[in-house]
């Protein structure tokens, strides 16, 4: 039976599509534009025109599919238009689950985010964590609200996955860009924080397993390992056989810097690369427990060093990083 995928041209979406094809599945991918359709065709899937904002197009795209993988979403920090995050992540998700039901879909696998957990500072987030009661970023808010929509309207159909920071070959944006800059020595100023990571292949594999073994209406955090920024730098030094020099900013200086850069961006009309919500998120840090997904879905997480080595090797293959031995 054919499955439908939203967000198939994104980093996680492409990994999910690849794993579906390797499993011998027939894949139909939602495509907003001709360029996206070309990417999907090149991957070996059938592109179908549709848009998260167009409910009827989603019904048409999902009709005849038993399963929908809703991977599409907008992940953006320091947004100039926070309403765009709500439109895509909340309203778009509402359209997806409603269209899936109307089209007779039996299972929706929804790619949420570990950010939606909202764990309190200094704690390890798990599926049952109580939200702290305030948001660190517009992105977190949008994903938390989207989960509420899914659980209110399609808990009987939908398995929710909450990936931590997804890293691996194919990603050089967001946290992936920070890892690249740190490896290249172009991130000389850091803040002390911790973060959880899931390997991109583990993330994709978990999506397929969630279709079969996931319980509708339940969350599954995907988190393979957690490390501090100091531990990440040490691991990069070991793999690259080089010294990484960085200065750690105190909290007050980081917050002040975010405010200043954000203010300058408003004056110039440019998109800030750094802002207060980014600093808040970094200073809060994130640690997640991915045990439930591993145990109930049935897979083992990739070790941290393996994920980092594969990521650096991909950077090198793409000409983004010079390393002595990318193997």
Model-derived regions: residue spans:
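NAD(P)-dependent short-chain dehydrogenase/reductase
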Residues: 157-197
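Conserved Rossmann-fold NAD(P)-dependent oxidoreductase catalytic core, especially the SDR/UDP-sugar
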Residues: 87-139
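Catalytic helix-loop patch of NAD(P)-dependent Rossmann-fold dehydrogenases
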Residues: 122-161, 165, 187
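NAD(P)H-binding glycine-rich loop region in Rossmannoid oxidoreductase-like domains
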Residues: 35-91, 99
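N-terminal Rossmann NAD(P)H-binding glycine-rich loop of SDR-like oxidoreductase domains
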Residues: 3-23
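Conserved catalytic-site region of short-chain dehydrogenase/reductase
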Residues: 77, 114-123, 166-172
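Substrate-positioning beta->alpha
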Residues: 95, 145, 174, 191-211, ...
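Mid/C-terminal beta-alpha module of Rossmann-like enzyme folds, strongest
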Residues: 206-273, 290, 303-327
């Amino acid at each position: 039976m054919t499955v439908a995928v939203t967000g198939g041209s994104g980093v996680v979406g492409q990994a999910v599509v690849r794993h579906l094809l390797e499993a011998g599945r027939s894949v139909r991918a939602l495509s907003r534009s001709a360029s996206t359709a070309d990417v999907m065709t090149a991957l070996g899937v059938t592109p179908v025109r549709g848009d998260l904002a167009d409910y009827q197009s989603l019904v048409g795209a999902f009709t005849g599919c038993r399963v929908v993988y809703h991977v599409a979403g907008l992940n953006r920090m320091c947004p100039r238009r926070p309403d765009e995050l709500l439109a895509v992540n909340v309203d778009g998700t509402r359209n997806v689950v409603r269209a899936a039901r109307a089209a007779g879909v039996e299972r929706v696998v929804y790619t949420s985010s570990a950010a939606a957990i909202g764990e309190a500072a200094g704690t390890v987030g798990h599926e049952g964590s109580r939200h702290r009661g305030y948001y660190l970023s517009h992105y977190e808010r949008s994903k938390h609200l989207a989960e509420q929509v899914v659980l209110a309207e399609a808990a009987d159909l939908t398995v929710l996955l909450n990936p931590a920071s997804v890293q691996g070959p194919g990603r050089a944006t967001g946290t992936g860009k920070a890892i690249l800059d740190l490896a290249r020595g172009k991130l000389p100023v850091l803040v002390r924080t911790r973060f959880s990571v899931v390997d991109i292949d583990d993330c994709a594999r978990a999506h397929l397993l969630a279709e079969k073994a996931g319980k509708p209406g339940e969350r599954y955090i995907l988190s393979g390992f957690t490390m501090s920024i100091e531990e990440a730098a040490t691991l990069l030094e070991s793999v690259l056989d080089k010294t990484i020099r960085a200065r750690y900013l105190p909290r007050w200086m980081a917050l002040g810097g975010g405010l200043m850069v954000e203010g300058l961006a408003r004056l110039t009309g440019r998109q800030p690369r750094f802002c207060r919500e980014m600093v808040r998120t970094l200073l809060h840090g994130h640690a997640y427990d991915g045990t439930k997904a591993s145990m109930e879905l049935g897979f083992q997480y990739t070790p941290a060093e393996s994920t980092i080595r594969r990521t650096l090797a991909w950077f090198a293959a793409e000409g983004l990083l010079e390393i002595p031995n990318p193997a």
